[in-house]
Every structure is written in structure tokens, then in C-alpha cells.
Design a protein with these regions (language model features):
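Short amphipathic alpha-helical interaction segments
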Residues: 44-58
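Amphipathic alpha-helical dimerization/coiled-coil segments
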Residues: 77-100
């Protein structure tokens, strides 16, 4: 598309953000407790983006902030079990839209 912002840009950004959140959860589970600097190094993500994702994940109750660093909460396992199903629902919905 030429000129202006594509109406799809925000969708792509949200999908990218969701992927970052999921990656951050996986690394946190594997290396917990883990701090912002280490998460930034491991994931290759700027610290400000790590802080943002941690804030969102904490708000959703998926991680817990401790003095030693972030740790996953009891909700982690259930959330990760639901990820494939939720992604499949998105794919089905996108396929439906593309056929209309």
C-alpha cells in the first residue's frame, strides 16, 4: 500500500507484541527469577520494551515481580496450554475473513 498507514499495521503490531509476551513468559519460566536487564539480553529486546511487556504480563496475573526478578505465576501453565487453541481460533477467523 502506498501512502498513509495500512489498516493492517496495528494488527501486525499486536501479533508481534503477543509473540514477544509469549517469548518473555517462556524465558521467565526457564530462568526465573529474572530481571529486566537479563531478559533484554536473552531476548535481544530493548529494556523499555521488556518493562512494558512485564507490566502487561503482571497486570494479567501471569508473572509476579519479586526483589530477585520476575517469576511466572500459577496461571502460567493454563495460559500456555491455551495458546495453541487461541492461535488456531485467530487463524480460522482470518481465513473466514479472507474468503468473504
Amino acid at each position: 500500500m502506498t501512502g498513509g498507514v495500512s489498516i493492517f499495521d496495528s494488527v501486525f503490531e499486536e501479533i508481534e507484541l503477543m509473540g514477544r509476551h509469549i517469548d518473555m513468559l517462556k524465558v521467565t519460566k526457564e530462568m526465573q527469577p529474572i530481571g529486566i536487564i537479563r531478559l533484554s539480553e536473552v531476548l535481544g529486546i530493548p529494556k523499555h520494551k521488556v518493562r512494558y511487556s512485564l507490566r502487561i504480563l503482571e497486570k494479567e496475573g501471569l508473572i509476579i515481580a519479586t526483589n530477585e526478578g520476575a517469576m511466572v505465576s500459577d496461571k502460567y501453565e493454563q495460559f500456555m496450554r491455551e495458546v495453541p487453541e487461541k492461535l488456531e481460533e485467530l487463524i480460522v477467523h482470518i481465513n473466514k475473513i479472507s474468503k468473504e
